[in-house]
Design a protein with these regions (language model features):
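Structured interaction patches on ligand/partner-binding surfaces of diverse proteins
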Residues: 37-38, 58-82, 135-156, 210-219
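Short Pro-Gly-centered beta-turn/loop motif in secreted/extracellular proteins
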Residues: 36-53, 57-60, 117-137, 190-212
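Intrinsically disordered, low-complexity segments enriched in Gly and acidic/Ser/Thr residues
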Residues: 156, 161-210
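Exposed beta-strand and adjacent loop surfaces of beta-rich binding modules
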Residues: 14-16, 51, 85, 98-100, ...
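Short, ordered, surface-exposed loop/turn motifs in non-cytosolic proteins
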Residues: 7-29, 92-110, 167-184
């Protein structure tokens, strides 16, 4: 199986492949694509009877259907699978316990993968939209992944806002953006102290004690 890069060469490798029986849909083989000692795609021995649908588990996956093999010969199957790398990183200290970026194809809503920050992820060449699960959310549109190149998305280091109250209450954090206030976090209404990791920006807190029965006690 030749995994073809953007230049028409069989250089892509080290991804799992699944061979399905075309008619029954059963999994016939799971194989990790490998280059042999000569740097060529390794030859695999499989049953030539029947036909196969092949899925290459890149991100997102690529596939080729209705593969018919000729018995007793060296069959070559080419599948386009050009890949590059996406790195997500924070500029400085990371106060998040866990921060991920949701990756989608540009203009689509289906999630392809949730990538951890400070990691690298191989992706099929193309354009992607990112939703970073920070507070508040950060969005990046039309992020381009090129063949064998690394694209880096870096966000500013966050800060921590500490809250302490005499009594539990209803509290919300809103961000000031272009003279508008956008809700970014709901505070725990059963706690008297809380720490919230926030991206740099201007914020306001709206709070009222839980046992107060008048809006004039809003802070």
């Amino acid at each position: 199986v030749n995994l073809i890069d953007a230049f028409g060469k069989a250089t892509e490798t080290n991804v799992p492949m699944t061979f399905y029986d075309k008619f029954s849909g059963d999994v016939r083989y799971n194989i990790m694509h490998t280059m042999n000692v000569k740097g060529n795609p390794d030859t695999i021995n499989i049953d030539p009877l029947g036909s196969y649908n092949i899925v290459v588990h890149t991100v997102p996956p690529v596939s080729k259907d209705s593969i018919v093999l000729v018995p007793g010969t060296h069959n070559i199957i080419g599948i386009d699978a050009p890949q590059g790398d996406l790195v997500l990183k924070i500029d400085g200290k990371n106060d998040y316990r866990e921060l991920k970026g949701i990756i989608r194809k540009s203009g689509e809503m289906n999630t392809i993968i949730a990538q951890d920050f400070n990691t690298s992820q191989r992706l099929i060449v193309g354009e992607y939209d990112l939703e970073i699960l920070s507070t508040p959310r950060i969005y990046a549109s039309n992020v381009h992944i090129d063949q064998s190149k690394t694209t880096t998305i870096q966000i500013p280091s966050p800060g921590i806002a500490n809250f302490q109250y005499n009594n539990p209450g209803y509290g919300y954090i809103v961000q000031e953006v272009n003279n508008k206030l956008n809700l970014v976090h709901t505070l725990n209404n059963n706690a008297t102290r809380e720490s919230v990791v926030l991206q740099p920006g201007n914020y306001r807190v709206v709070y009222r004690p839980k046992n107060s029965q008048s809006s004039q006690y809003t802070i």
